[in-house]
Structures are given as structure tokens and as C-alpha cells.
Design a protein with these regions (language model features):
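Generic alpha-helical secondary structure signal
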Residues: 54-56, 60, 213, 245, ...
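Extracellular/periplasmic, surface-exposed regions of secreted and cell-surface proteins
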Residues: 1-199
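Single, functionally critical "micro-switch" positions that shape active/binding sites
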Residues: 82, 246, 263
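Conserved small-residue
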Residues: 50-51, 138, 157-260
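Disulfide-bonded cysteine-rich modules in secreted/extracellular proteins
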Residues: 69, 206, 210-211, 266-268
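Short, hydrophobic/aromatic alpha-helical segments in well-folded domains
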Residues: 80, 95, 251-254, 266-270
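A short local loop/turn or secondary-structure capping micro-motif enriched for an aromatic residue
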Residues: 116-117, 259-261
Length: 272
């Protein structure tokens, strides 16, 4: 599947240019009012050259005996997925652009929804070594990003002095929809990069043990749940870990979602 089709479309309606809008005196303070929307599909094939071809290697391990003679051999070293195709990202945007009082005040807002499917990645430790071959790039998993973007600005001129102020604020929510490979949760990432991947949670999440303050005395250590498996020799001043499973001890079963490495809120401010 070396070829792909990635259409896009965008439309806008500037209401402030309509005759009915210009004739409305109550709306004269609005210089610009525009509604806009877009939809598009982007493709990603950033996986190197010829990922759809199997590779062969020469070496002693591939040699073979023919007619009593030890002969140079070659063998396939990489298994290629014959259904490999483009990773696709579908994006929908809707928004509004406004300007008021001779463009002294501007305000823009937009909502976006972005879904990525057939994510390309190359497994490393996610399959058995008994297989005997390396795996090429494969398509698996999907995720979504959605959120809001806001921008507000003010510009003016006082005598010979001109200035402008603008600020922006965005909200984004990231969620793993599918992991492929049977939706097996990846506690160390699909490619062994330490990023925990769980269905319904953000990518690059923090996954670990919850704490409940620190031990104030050694007596508290004795009365607390057994946490010797993760923090042996705990004493006063050490962290107290929560027994989420309720089995009286703190171990691997007590790990939980702690948050995302991807910031949910971002903002900026500009002056000039």
C-alpha cells in the first residue's frame, strides 16, 4: 500500500461582510465576525526507505552444507507486514474570528478533534525471541487529541505611541483508543521506551505508586501496610505508599495512573 489519498476541505463565512450585518446599527461595533470549519486527512510514512521489503543477511549462522561443502548462505532477517500502509490523522476544526471597536480588540476561538489511526511503529521487545526474525514497521493502535484554543488581543495608539497585547490559552486532552496487538496494555511502551500505554488514558502517562505522606515515627512504620517489596528498611522520614488493592501489602498490584506527561493547559502572553 505505497499510495494514499489524503483530501481536505475548508470553508468560512464572514458574516460581517453580509449586507444585513452592515445595515444593523446595533452591530456596528463589530468589525469582523467569521465562522470557519475544516476537515482533512494527513498521511505519515516517516518510516525510512523500502519498509515493505524483506531483508536478507549473509553470515556464518546462515551457511549450509551442500554436497559435503560448507557453502555461504543467506537468510531472511526481517519479517515484513504485507498489509503495511500509511498512518492517517483525521482532523476536524471549527472556530470563530472576531474584531471589535475598529480592531482594537480581537478574539478567536477554535475547537479541534484529531484522531490518528494505523499508527506506525517498529516492535522491539513486544514479541517472543523464539520467533527468530526482527519485525518491520507495522500498523497498530489509534489515539485521539481534542481541545480548545483561545486567543485575545488588544492594540491601540495613544499619540505617537503604539502598543499591542495578546494572549493565548489552549486545552488539550489526549487518549489512547486502541493499542492493536490484542489491546495488550504496554507498561513499558510499545517500543520499550518507558512510556506507559493504557486504554482510555493519555500517552506518556506516569504509572506508579501513590503516596500518603511520610512516616513520622518508626512505630508508624510497624503499623503501616507491608511495603518491604518496594521500600525495604523503611523508617521515620520515608514515604508511605498506599495499598490500593487492599491486600495488606504494597506491591506491583498497587500501581496506578498518576498523571500525564503531556500538559493539559498551555498559555502565552505577548507585548509589543
Amino acid at each position: 500500500n505505497k499510495f494514499g489519498f489524503f483530501p481536505s476541505v475548508a470553508a468560512g463565512w464572514r458574516l460581517s461582510e453580509e449586507q444585513f450585518f452592515k445595515e444593523a446599527e446595533s452591530l456596528s461595533f463589530i468589525d469582523n465576525l467569521k465562522l470557519k470549519a475544516s476537515y482533512g486527512i494527513l498521511g505519515n510514512n516517516n518510516i525510512g526507505n523500502y519498509p515493505y521489503q524483506s531483508t536478507y543477511a549473509l553470515g556464518k549462522a546462515m551457511n549450509y552444507v551442500f554436497g559435503g561443502v560448507y557453502t555461504q548462505g543467506a537468510a531472511v532477517t526481517t519479517y515484513v507486514d504485507p498489509t503495511l500502509k500509511w498512518e492517517k490523522t483525521r482532523t476536524t476544526d471549527v472556530g470563530i474570528e472576531t474584531a471589535f471597536w475598529k480592531n482594537k480588540l480581537t478574539f478567536n476561538a477554535a475547537y479541534f478533534y484529531r484522531k490518528t489511526t494505523d499508527i506506525l511503529y517498529k516492535p522491539s521487545a513486544s514479541y517472543s525471541s523464539i520467533f527468530g526474525l526482527a519485525l518491520s514497521q507495522v500498523n497498530t493502535g489509534s489515539l485521539e487529541n481534542k481541545g480548545w484554543e483561545f486567543e485575545i488581543g488588544h492594540q491601540n495608539k495613544v499619540g505617537e505611541f503604539s502598543y499591542h497585547v495578546n494572549g493565548n490559552f489552549s486545552i488539550i486532552k489526549n487518549k489512547v483508543i486502541s493499542l492493536g496487538v490484542g489491546d495488550v496494555e504496554q507498561k513499558s511502551g510499545m517500543i520499550g521506551n518507558g512510556s506507559n500505554l493504557f486504554l482510555g488514558y493519555p500517552m506518556n502517562m506516569f504509572y506508579g505508586y501513590k503516596t500518603d505522606g511520610v512516616f513520622l515515627t518508626d512505630e508508624e512504620v510497624k503499623e503501616w501496610h507491608d511495603q518491604s517489596k518496594i521500600a525495604p528498611n523503611s523508617k521515620a522520614g520515608d514515604l508511605r505508599y498506599v495499598d490500593i488493592s487492599g491486600d495488606g501489602k504494597v506491591d506491583e498490584a498497587d500501581k496506578a495512573y498518576l498523571g500525564s506527561k503531556i500538559p493539559q493547559y498551555t498559555f502565552g502572553l505577548g507585548l509589543g
